Amino acid sequence: MDTANDADRLQMLLYSAYDSDTVRDMERPLLDDGTPLMRMAASAAAQVTMTLLDDEDLAVEDARIAVLVGTGDNGGDGLYAGAILAREGAQVTAIATGRSLHDAAFAAFVHAGGRVLVLDPNADIPGCATGFSAGEAGERLQAAVEYAQGSHVILDAMTGIGVAGALRGIPGTIAASLGLTSRLPDRPALSNNEPSADLPLGVAVYPPS
């Protein structure tokens, strides 16, 4: 086994960005073969999160984690990762930025003890509030931002390879409120009393046209 090359490939996957078509081409044979990519991505994200917490001498059961969750499969990745972390004892809240959630991942997350904060008044998520007023929507957004700002780790699972252009609507608003619209942080865990990590589960980019 060529472990040196394996390590190089892992580093490349962790720290490189690929356009959406390339990601789809890489995924297609694995999906055709029935590889459980969503569960694998979630497990990897959860493991990286636990490693970051350990590096900061913070026990998982003492950690407060925010998962920014969109409606698609990337949101499912985040929910499954959140479920793993919740089962390990972390306090995990999923901040739902869209009107629905990946059904199976949502069920796994709730079963693991995760909590859900819905931001869209038109959301249709089982067991969660819906049809609330514009005033309450603003209060929920503020609560979500404050929760994320006070979290040790933020998992960004709002969008995946299906998105094009800048973030809009609730995802755009919450990203701007958290200061996540510019460059990535210099290091994943900040040197303060409450380390924070922005861990995109997947970043797909198109080159400028």
Task: Spell out what each predicted region is.
Residues 1-62:
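Positively charged, low-complexity intrinsically disordered leader regions
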Residues 2-18, 58-209:
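Glycine-rich phosphate/dinucleotide-binding loop and adjoining beta-alpha-beta core of small-molecule
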